[in-house]
Each structure stands twice: as C-alpha cells, then as structure tokens.
C-alpha cells in the first residue's frame, strides 16, 4: 500500500467454514500499534464481530497505518473500533491510513467505526479501496468530530481527507470515486459549508436490496430528524450490477450521527437478512 514503514498493520481474512457454519478468521496478522480483540458472535446469524484496538491512545504526525480486510464467499463479518480515533497535532506531516477491503459472492461486511476526532493543527488522510462482488453487502459508516480547543474554536484542524473507491470485482468497473476534503481555514465562517453544525458523517451502503424507493424512504427519515441534517444519494454505474447509496450528514453531537448510522444498518439487516439490530455492546 505504501513504501513508508507503517506504525500499525492489520490483516484479516474471514470465511464461513467455522462450526455450524459460523464465519471465522482464517488469516489474522497484526504488527505495531494495531490489534484486534478476540472475536464475538453478537447474535445467532453466524456473523463474526471483530474490534480493532489502536495502541498508544492517538495518531501522531507522520504516522502511517495499513488495514486489509477480506470476507470470502458467503461469510459475514462486522468490524468496529474500541473507541474514537484521535488525531493530534501533525507538524511532522499528515497521519495517513490505507484500507483495502474485498467482499466476495453473497458475503457481508459491516464496517462501523467510532468517530475520528481531529484536534487543532492536525491533518489526516484516509484512503479506502473497496472491491465488491455484485451479490455482496457492504456497509461503512464514519463520523468526524472537531477536537477540544482552549479558545472554544470548533474547526481548529488543518485538513481532513477521506478518499474512497468502490470497484466491481467481476468487471473491474468503478462504481464510486469519492473525495471528501475538509479544510476549515479555506472558509470564512461556516456559511455554505456546515452552516451551524460542527460534526459530519457519511455512510456508504452497497447491496442488491438498494433501490431508489429505499433512498427516498431514507431521505424522508432524514428530513424529519430534528438533530441531523443531510441527504442520501443513489449509486450505480454503467457496466456493473453493483448499486448502493451514500449518505452525508451534519449534526452538533457525535451520538446523533452514530445512532442514525446504526439505525440504518439495523433497518437494512432486518429487511435483507432477517437479522437482529446492531448491538455493539461497548458500554
């Protein structure tokens, strides 16, 4: 992924050959500042759940992290984090995280991370490459929270860049190329950028069950939400059967964004797989 020596490396490969058809890790490698807690099964669906731990309490300037997740055909996995990712001052250069994700035929991956907290004078670059089979289900959510500032300033970080690519594994066609770039200092005030809101979120869902009716339903729910502002957009591309949606949201509280993302994930897992709602059991 990168020629720079990473501070933390994590690789997981998951199949469905465990006892009673449970999904399990057949390859697990970690080095440096990244670890995973022993797997859990949060319901009787056979979906395995892994929690990522970042040793050290926060990311520092110049740090590079690499993650690779592979979910083989028919396997089901949920990956989350133990706590928020904290980006401190980065005078030595940006913090960079590379993630590669591969999800096979009829496989499921829900990647529900805690918030990323960007403190003053910090720069964070995240590059995520996702390769999906058209019959797979992929859910990814993330939240960006401005860190504490002694002067009470909301947007004291320098730059946040979230670059995401999604490709069809059967045709090689690109379905999504998204580059979310936040540079608070390039804006005078918040008008036209985040209005009165301080926290931002995004959720990407790919699956056979996504259609324009579902997108319209989610937009109606967002419009009625008293504490979150946002929109959901349908994703598709010529030459591929992959389809999905991306939701962009704003709020003043991290919990509102996390609760919304977990609500959507629970709604879809219930409709598509008859599975119980998300319950990460962190608190």
Swiss-Prot record:
A molecular function GO annotation: nickel cation binding
Localization annotation: Cytoplasm
Gene Ontology cellular-component annotations: cytoplasm
InterPro entries membership: UreD
Pfam assignment, any one: UreD
Region (Disordered): 1-20
Keywords attached to this entry: Chaperone, Cytoplasm, Nickel insertion
Highest taxon of the lineage: Bacteria
Function: Required for maturation of urease via the functional incorporation of the urease nickel metallocenter.
Subunit relationships: UreD, UreF and UreG form a complex that acts as a GTP-hydrolysis-dependent molecular chaperone, activating the urease apoprotein by helping to assemble the nickel containing metallocenter of UreC. The UreE protein probably delivers the nickel.
Entries under HAMAP family matching the protein: UreD (MF_01384)
Family to which the UniProt record says this protein belongs: Belongs to the UreD family.
Protein name: Urease accessory protein UreD
Organism: Corynebacterium glutamicum (strain R)
């Amino acid at each position: 992924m990168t020629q720079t020596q990473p501070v933390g490396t994590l690789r997981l490969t998951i199949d469905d050959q465990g006892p009673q058809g449970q999904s399990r890790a057949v390859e697990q490698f970690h080095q440096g500042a990244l670890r995973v807690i022993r797997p859990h099964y949060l319901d009787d669906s056979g979906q395995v759940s892994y929690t990522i731990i970042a040793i050290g309490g926060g990311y520092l300037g110049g740090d590079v992290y690499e993650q690779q997740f592979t979910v083989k055909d028919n396997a089901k996995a949920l990956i989350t984090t133990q706590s928020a990712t904290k980006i401190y001052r980065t005078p030595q250069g940006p913090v960079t995280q590379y993630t590669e994700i591969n999800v096979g035929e009829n496989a499921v991956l829900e990647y529900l991370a805690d918030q990323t907290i960007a403190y003053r004078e910090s720069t964070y670059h995240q590059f995520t490459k996702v390769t999906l089979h058209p019959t797979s289900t992929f859910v990814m959510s993330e939240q960006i929270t401005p860190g504490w500032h002694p002067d009470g300033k909301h947007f004291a970080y320098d730059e946040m860049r979230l670059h995401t690519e999604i490709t069809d594994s059967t045709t090689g066609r690109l379905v999504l190329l998204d580059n979310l770039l936040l540079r608070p200092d390039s804006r005078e005030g918040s008008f036209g950028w985040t209005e009165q809101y301080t926290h931002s979120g995004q959720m990407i869902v790919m699956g056979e069950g996504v259609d324009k009716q579902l997108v319209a339903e989610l937009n109606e729910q967002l419009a009625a939400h008293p504490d979150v502002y946002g929109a959901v957009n349908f994703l598709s591309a010529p030459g591929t059967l992959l389809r999905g949606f991306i939701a962009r949201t704003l709020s003043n509280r991290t919990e509102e964004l996390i609760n919304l993302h977990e609500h959507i994930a629970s709604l879809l897992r219930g409709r598509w797989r008859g599975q119980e709602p998300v319950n990460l059991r962190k608190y």
